[in-house]
Amino acid sequence: MRSRKLTGAVRSSARLKARSCSAARLASAQEVAGSTSAKTACLTSSSHKATDTRTSKKFKCDKGHLVKSELQKLVPKNDSASLPKVTPETPCENEFAEGSALLPGSEAGVSVQQGAASLPLGGCRVVSDSRLAKTRDGLSVPKHSAGSGAEESNSSSTVQKQNEPGLQTEDVQKPPLQMDNSVFLDDDSNQPMPVSRFFGNVELMQDLPPASSSCPSMSRREFRKMHFRAKDDDDDDDDDAEM
């Protein structure tokens, strides 16, 4: 009987231990599930906040673009054309400089410069149109320059025509080259070369008298005798000077 009681007590204690272990496992599993649910809730809330902020920023940007487009539609085209535009200043200045050069007188140039200072940068086309209209009315000087160029061309043509007869007379006065059939031109001939072609008239040279020698011709012996005599005379003079 005692052995049965002992075995029953051991079994009951083992059952209690198994129940307590299962309860502890269930509690730990519930705790893990609660922590994961809290984490997922935090993540979902943060993602919702991020999406809300992004959508709000996009909504604000869209609102700004819509407001700008509405303002541009409300502003008339004339007002938009009158607004100052950022354009390079160099073409305008070049056009005003050309206009002042075309207009006669200093007053026209001063008026054009004043107009350039008063008008905005976008009014370059108006000034260029007015300048073209003034040139059509006859205030510019390109026509005169074209006329002067035509006059200069006419004068140069007349001068050339006047010079042409003089050139023709000079050509007529020059005698043409005459090729004679002389012996000098014949390469195969054995006759002597004509001297008159190089030295002029040879007959005048033959009439001249022969060149006279300055000193008479003497032999070598006579020259030696004279040399020694002169040498002896020099020695005698030296002796007399020493005495």
Swiss-Prot record:
GO CC annotation, single: nucleoplasm
Entry keyword annotation includes Nucleus: yes
Modification type Phosphoserine: residues: 148, 189
Compartments, record wording: Nucleus
Region (Disordered): 78-100, 132-243
InterPro entries for the chain: UPF0688
Acidic residues biased stretches: 233-243
Primary site of residence: nucleus
Composition-biased stretches (Low complexity): 145-157
UniProt family annotation: Belongs to the UPF0688 family.
Protein name: UPF0688 protein C1orf174
Source organism (scientific name): Homo sapiens
